[in-house]
Amino acid sequence: MHYLRIYFFLFISIASALTIAGQDDPIKIDSSIVRLNVGVVDQRGRPITSLDRTSFAIYEDGIKQEISRFEASTAPFSVVMLLDMSGSTKSFRPNIKLSAARFLDALAPDDRVAVVEFYSKVNLLSDFSADKRLAAQSIELANGQGETNLYKALQFALERLSNERTRRKAIVVLTDGVDTNARNDDRKILSSKPESEMATALKAESSGAFNKLLRDADLQGVTIYPLALPTGDPKRLADPTPLQFALYDNSRRRLQLIADRTGGRLNAINRLEEMGKLYAIVAADLRTLYTIEYDPSNDKHDGQWRTVKIEVPGTELIARSRQGYFAR
């Protein structure tokens, strides 16, 4: 009966995922509100978690903004765990599952977690719940092969998070970073270039799907933490051609841009043994973030970049968050 329950759970999870993932509804958020997840450290890099609303000053394009909502670092998160189950990860799946399960143990009791696997498909294995045992069971069921549908998975995660209303939001994505569709598009660009120009021919922002997920992350104030597997590291390729190096390098730069634009951090996994430690670092970082919202004094939706700066006046503390957004 135990195995029957497991297989029934797997069937229901994947069946519902195929239905949900097939939807292409736009994310609807009150885009006039800017949400920032903010980490604060001292000069030695130690997290500061005892600040309140009056400790912060927010500037947009140099103009001070009025904080409309503030949540302390103890407020719960809604987190999507994205697990790369493409063919390139097959040889170390046990490491992935063990490390991901330990990440759950490091979260706060009220944090809600959803688990999503991606490869050629994107499957919701378990929806948001504070029941970490359910999430752990879902991680064990993760399996797949084939291509890497990374950007579709991130977009799907953002769509799920849009239903989490006013909760603090984050995505933790374990991947080599090489999205198959974007790589194929990059290859087409490079096909007309001589090898001497390939290293500088690609731009991270050249992918439409990539740019859309950045915009949607902006709208919700979602912080994204990529955990980059060594199989996607261009420096680890064995005697790569200029084309191969350019493709992998652009994929890794996109992961870095995702982290930078959303206020997260890119954690490169150099050895598989480090995976659990880096998951723990991400969990610890989530527990130190404040969430701040403001209604911009510039109410134009002109698509222009707005630079955001966060200060903790009268101190030498350092605040980290996303550096801005496009006003759409």
Where are these regions (language model features)?
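Scaffold/interface architecture of coatomer-like assemblies
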Residues: 20-328
